[in-house]
From Swiss-Prot:
The modification N6-(pyridoxal phosphate)lysine is found at residue 226. Homodimer. Interacts with SufE and the SufBCD complex composed of SufB, SufC and SufD. The interaction with SufE is required to mediate the direct transfer of the sulfur atom from the S-sulfanylcysteine. This is Cysteine desulfurase. It comes from Salmonella dublin (strain CT_02021853). GO terms for biological process: cysteine metabolic process. The lineage of its organism: Bacteria, Pseudomonadati, Pseudomonadota, Gammaproteobacteria, Enterobacterales.
Length: 406
């Protein structure tokens, strides 16, 4: 069955607008995806008809809002096949989720002389928290290097592990290269050394189904805004036994059991002990609607369509004069490139004049830019609402830029 891309596009009102007098070609979903009417309407309806502070309220609106919020927790747990909804913590996004793990689990479990393994392709969100933790604890941060094609040099991974390795923190899919890392093999190796595993799933969950039980990872984190949901909301999955042992890292309302000026404070059970303060309930409702939306379309069908579009895009872009494409042939979601010696910012500015939105810069992956020896790259990302015609416009735009700039 053909993927109904035009029907999908009709659900996204922003795709009807023009930029610089031309139809918008939005090729920046890896930074943040656009939102369908179903998400916009669900969040709006909550604020119009159902808003109240959650937890402890006895009135109808509060009870219903709390129930709606917890239903999304259950829904998200099914989405990634967690064993229990109580393994999921609502966070602001992937960055906060990783920082939570670093400041809670990491503070309790990392000692001087221990080491943490990351890769050279990580987003800053999966580098900086571990740098801070290692500096504070006197631990070592070890790095898996890259092959020129943008895949990890897995033959070096075994040598990085030893009996002081406490954590492997790895991206599921690179936000620059689109590389999907072989998590089962990497996690199996970590298990041989008794190390925990954190997976940054920010660039994976919108492209195919994720099964955290099958992966057997300890932590999995993703953001709602890349999954066609609202900003300011994300999910941190932690294996239940591990989560129950972790101390809170933020204090305040809703995360306590009792508070006494003389007897101290006791914590709520997990996951609520990690959700201090008033939550982003509207964002949570919107996230639930986003999960409903992609589930109704079928992640397998979305993935098949996106892969067909990716193959077409790579074939067509390879014909652009003087273009350099970065990353492996088999990839998910993104195509990073440079055009001759022209700065990515200039190329992106020209494309914007043609109504084409791409991302330019270091993509929060400065170590990766350094490895390739470039200050920046352009990045076009492909989502379920993109079309062959938009790819053709990108190719035509780049060909025109090459002709203009030489």
């Amino acid at each position: 069955m053909t993927f109904p891309v035009e029907k999908v596009r009709a659900d996204f009102p922003i795709l009807q607008r023009e930029v610089n007098g031309l139809p918008l070609a939005y090729l920046d979903s890896a930074a943040s995806a656009q939102k369908p009417n179903q998400v916009i309407d669900a969040e709006s309806a909550f604020y119009r008809h159902g808003y109240a502070a959650v937890h402890r309220g006895i009135h109808t609106l509060s009870v219903q809002a709390t129930e709606s919020m917890e239903n999304v927790r259950k829904q998200a747990s099914r989405f990634i096949n967690a064993r229990s909804a109580e393994e999921l913590v609502f966070v602001r996004g992937t960055t906060e989720g990783i920082n939570l793990v670093a400041n809670s689990w990491g503070t309790e479990n990392i000692r001087a002389g221990d080491n943490i393994i990351i890769s050279e392709m990580e987003h800053h969100a999966n580098i900086v928290p571990w740098q801070i933790l290692c500096e504070r604890k006197g631990a070592e941060l070890r790095v898996i290097p890259l092959h020129p094609d943008g895949t990890l040099r897995l033959e070096t991974l075994a040598a990085l592990f030893d009996d002081r390795t406490r954590l492997l923190a790895i991206t599921h899919v690179s936000n620059v290269l689109g590389t999907e890392n072989p998590l089962p093999d990497m996690i199996a190796l970590a298990r041989q050394h008794g190390a925990k595993v954190l997976v940054d799933g920010a660039q994976a969950v919108m492209h195919h189904a994720v099964d955290v039980q099958a992966l057997d990872c300890d932590f999995y984190v993703f953001s709602g805004h890349k999954l066609y949901g609202p900003t300011g909301i994300g999910i941190l999955y932690v294996k239940e036994a591990l989560l129950q042992e972790m101390p809170p890292w933020e204090g305040g309302g809703s995360m306590i059991s009792t508070v006494s000026l003389t007897q101290g404070t006791t914590w709520a059970k997990a996951p609520w002990r990690f959700e201090a303060g008033t939550p982003n309930t509207g964002g949570i409702i919107g996230l639930g609607a986003a999960i409903d939306y992609v589930t109704s379309l079928g992640l397998d069908k979305i993935g098949d369509y996106e892969q067909m579009l990716m193959r077409y895009a790579l074939e067509q872009l390879a014909q652009v004069p003087d273009i350099t494409l970065y990353g492996p042939a088999q990839r998910l979601g993104v195509i990073a490139f440079n055009l001759g010696k022209h700065h990515a910012y200039d190329v992106g500015s020209f494309l914007d004049n043609y109504g084409i939105a791409v991302r330019t810069g270091h993509h929060c992956a400065m170590p990766l830019m350094a490895w390739y020896g470039v200050p920046a790259m352009c990045r076009a990302s492909l989502a379920m609402y993109n079309t062959h015609e938009e790819v053709d416009r990108l190719v035509a735009g780049l060909t025109r830029i090459h002709r203009l700039l030489g």
